[in-house]
Amino acid sequence: MSGAYRQDLNWLVSDFTARVPDVAHAAVISADGVPLSLSDGIPPYFAEQLAAITSGLASLMQGAARIFEAGLPTQGLVEMEGGLMIIKAISDGSSLCVLAAPDCDTELVAYEMSVLVEAAGEVLSPALRGASPGGMTPPSMGGRRPPISPLQGAAAKTAAPPSRW
């Protein structure tokens, strides 16, 4: 993975996670699985995994929409026991991915995602990848990676931590 994400745009998604209740992490991912911007607290190795999963799910959503002749997909939701993964299309195949607590207000989260995409869609477009500085290198741990609780950030912002993450 090239790891060419826009560190100077991370504040957009970090601000989103700070403002929206029960949201732990957010990332903007290109169609080809490259993290374009990341919220605070996402380790590099987790960003790579999240990017691959997000681009894969976005591709599946696009394939389903094509087969069912249902127009372009705008949003997808993966509901798990320990939390939600919400994916929203931005432009040119890029996506905003949000990890939230299982009992979050999904309507509020989806609304805030739409506001972010509308307000910052051009800024977050994949065309900026070519100008991206630096890269990410996963930590060296002898082949092991520490477990991450994807929603640990949500627990710090809410009175009661999410049920599982």
Language-model regions, residue ranges each:
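Acidic, low-complexity cytosolic segments
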Residues: M1-V23, D32-W165
